[in-house]
Regions:
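Short beta-strand-centered aromatic/proline hotspots
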Residues: 222-251
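Active-site catalytic motif of lipid deacylating hydrolases and related acyltransferases
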Residues: 2-57, 184
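Gly/Ala-rich beta-loop-alpha elbow adjacent to hydrolase catalytic centers
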Residues: 63-72
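Short coil-to-beta transition motif at edge beta-strands of beta-rich domains
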Residues: 203-232
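Active-site signature of alpha/beta-hydrolase-fold catalytic machinery across serine-
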Residues: 74-78
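The alpha/beta-hydrolase serine catalytic core
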Residues: 84-200
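Intrinsically disordered, low-complexity, charged/polar segments
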Residues: 252-293
Length: 293
C-alpha cells in the first residue's frame, strides 16, 4: 500500500500541538499523514521549529491558522516536497495590532495542554515589538502553490485588518480566497470546501477579454475585464463600472459559501479608492457570468 504524503499543521496564538483543529484537519485531509507543530510567541524561534520539522519530513502540504499562518509565510519551502501546497487561513499578518487592540496585554492561559509543559504566556509591549521587528526584518518565502483564505466575518482581525492582510499575502505571491460565512476560527465546512474546490483543481479559468461581473455594496452591476496573467494596468480606466488591470487569478466558483477573490494588481490607491472596506469583491453565479461571456 502506498504511504501517505507528509503534512504539517501550525496552530494559532494561545494554542498548541493538541489543538482540536488538527482533528478536523486530519478528518478532512485523511489521505495525508499529519504532524502538528507546536510554536510560541517568539517568531524567530517558532519559524526555526517549523523549518526543523520541514527538514525532517519534507511535507507535501503545509497548513496554518492565524499566527500559525503568519509563521508559515516564512517557512523553508525549498526543503518541502517539490510542488508542495502551502495553505494559510486568516493569517495574523498584523498580530501586534491585534494584541494591542483586541486581545489585550497580560498573563494568558493556553487553551490546550502544551508539549513543552508551559500553561501560561505573557503578552505585553515587548512581545508586540518582537513581532514587528521580525516582520520588518524578514521577507516571506516563495512557494509554487501558495494560497491564503480569509473569512470576511473575521471578528478578531476586523474588516480593515482583513483587507490589509489580503494585500500582504497578495504581494507575497499568494492566491487569495474568501470564506463568506466563517469567522476567525477555522470551520470544518471551510476545509471541506477548500478540498473540493482547491486541491481537486475543480475550477474554471476565464478567457482573456472576458467581462467578469462582481457585486459591491453599491447598486448596479460592476465589471472587471480579464487581461490575463501579468497584463499591464491601464491607469485611464478610473471608472467604478470597469476595473482594468492585471489579474493575479480569476476563478469561477458558484458555491454560496466560498468565493474566489478577484484581485487587481497592484493593490494600490487605484484599487482602494474605488472599493470600500464593505466592497470586498464577490463573484456572481455561473448563470450571471454566462450572460456576459
Amino acid at each position: 500500500m502506498e504511504s501517505k504524503k507528509k503534512a504539517i499543521y501550525v496552530h494559532g496564538l494561545g494554542s498548541g500541538a493538541a489543538s482540536t483543529t488538527i482533528d478536523i484537519v486530519r478528518k478532512v485531509f485523511s489521505d495525508y499523514e499529519w504532524t502538528p507543530v507546536e510554536v510560541n510567541e517568539d517568531p524567530v524561534d517558532s519559524v526555526n521549529i517549523i523549518n526543523h520539522t520541514i527538514g525532517q519530513l519534507h511535507p507535501a502540504l503545509l497548513m496554518g491558522t492565524s499566527l500559525g499562518g503568519l509563521y508559515l509565510m516564512y517557512a523553508d519551502m525549498d526543503s518541502c516536497e517539490d510542488n508542495a501546497i502551502r495553505f494559510i487561513f486568516n493569517p495574523a499578518c498584523d498580530i501586534a495590532r491585534v494584541i494591542r487592540e483586541t486581545i489585550g496585554f497580560g498573563t494568558k492561559e493556553y487553551f490546550v495542554p502544551r508539549l513543552d509543559g508551559i500553561q501560561e504566556y505573557v503578552l505585553d509591549e515587548s512581545v508586540c515589538a518582537r513581532f514587528e521587528n521580525f516582520i520588518a526584518g524578514y521577507q516571506p518565502t516563495s512557494g509554487k502553490r501558495d494560497y491564503a483564505m480569509f473569512s470576511i466575518k473575521d471578528e478578531l482581525i476586523g474588516p480593515a485588518g482583513v483587507r490589509n492582510n489580503q494585500r500582504v499575502c497578495y504581494e507575497a505571491g499568494y492566491r487569495i480566497l474568501l470564506d463568506w460565512e466563517g469567522g476567525h476560527r477555522l470551520r470544518c465546512q471551510t476545509l471541506r470546501l477548500s478540498r473540493t474546490h482547491l486541491f481537486d483543481e475543480r475550477k474554471t479559468k476565464y478567457r482573456v477579454g472576458d467581462r467578469v461581473l462582481f457585486k459591491t455594496s453599491e447598486p448596479g452591476e460592476h465589471f472587471l475585464r480579464y487581461y490575463g496573467e501579468g497584463g499591464p494596468m491601464d491607469p485611464r480606466a478610473r471608472r467604478k463600472e470597469e476595473f482594468v488591470g492585471a489579474i493575479k487569478s480569476i476563478y469561477l466558483e458558484s458555491t454560496p459559501q466560498l468565493y474566489y477573490a478577484v484581485t487587481v494588481a497592484p493593490l494600490s490607491s487605484f484599487y482602494c479608492s474605488f472599493v470600500s472596506e464593505k466592497d470586498i469583491m464577490r463573484l456572481a453565479t455561473e448563470e450571471d457570468l454566462g450572460r456576459l461571456c
